[in-house]
Design a protein with these regions (language model features):
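Flexible loop/hinge segments at secondary-structure junctions
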Residues: 1-274
């Protein structure tokens, strides 16, 4: 989630502090967590909180700092199918389980009675790397589909029943954009930048809601207070106008008061999040 905005933050911050240099790479939440744990980077970021096992394996305490709210969109590329597709959780789960294989499947047609759905094969595109985006998306599917929860579950790395893997949000975005019949899940900014069509998703209120600043903010607004470790989940929360696949993205900050690089990181975060 955080890569598009954090690179903008770096650029703006360096205008005020030219002594600081940043080298940030979008390698997926799984890769970011591994680098933080191996202490090869000064800080990291993740779209899925570190597990208790991961935190216990850290050489130094690590704080989760919620930095932004984002959303996982369901992007598609189908010739003749204009923007405005609606999907509910059960249908999404069945697509990614490999049970719904045609775009004119009755389950899709029932939700989209006015859409001209072609008999095109559905190509599922999913992440091949350890991914917080995958964790967010699979957590949503596990919440709305008993079959998905029992057969696949949720996490940064899961055993996909079907589909072609691509690396990073960038890879999934590119694969969907160039393939007729493709469907995949990507962070909102990537869908917008690539001008991909995205589906409106059914929330707990029964509303079909598109991902937007407003609908993501509404998801965050349902959270009245943070837990002590700041790792609260707002995926599929109940609220009017909520986009159901919304989530925080966290900065992972090792605790080492004597570290000069970490002092610089804390100063940057104080500027970025004030």
């Amino acid at each position: 989630f955080i890569y598009p905005i954090v690179t903008k933050w770096f650029s703006e911050y360096q205008k005020t502090n030219k002594e600081v240099e940043f080298n940030y790479q979008s390698i997926g939440s799984g890769g970011g967590i591994k680098q933080v744990l191996s202490q090869t980077v000064d800080f990291g970021a993740t779209d899925a909180p570190m597990t208790t096992e991961e935190l216990n394996s850290a050489k130094k305490p690590i704080r989760h700092i919620p930095a932004i709210l984002g959303a996982v969109t369901v992007a598609y590329n189908v010739k003749g199918l204009e923007a405005g597709l609606k999907l509910d959780g059960e249908t999404m789960a069945n697509i990614f389980l490999g049970k719904v294989t045609k775009w004119n499947d009755p389950s899709i047609a029932k939700i989209n009675p006015k859409a001209k759905l072609p008999a095109t094969d559905i190509l599922v595109v999913r992440r091949s790397d350890g991914s917080g985006t995958t964790a967010v998306y699979s957590t949503f599917l596990a919440d709305v589909s008993k079959e998905w929860k029992e057969k696949v579950g949720a996490g940064k790395n899961i055993n996909w029943p079907t589909g072609i893997g691509a690396k990073g949000n960038e890879g999934v975005t590119a694969m969907v954009a160039q393939t007729d019949g493709a469907i995949g899940y990507v962070e909102l900014a990537y869908a917008i930048n690539s001008k991909l069509a995205t589906a409106s998703i059914k929330n707990k209120k029964g509303e079909f809601v598109a991902a937007s600043v407003d609908s993501i903010t509404r998801a965050g607004a349902t959270l009245k207070d943070f837990s002590g470790d700041l790792t609260n989940n707002v995926i599929n929360v109940d609220g009017k106008g909520v986009y159901p696949i919304s989530s925080f993205s966290w900065i992972l900050l090792p605790q080492d008061p004597a570290s000069e690089p970490l002092k610089a990181v804390r100063a940057f975060l104080g500027w970025a999040l004030k």
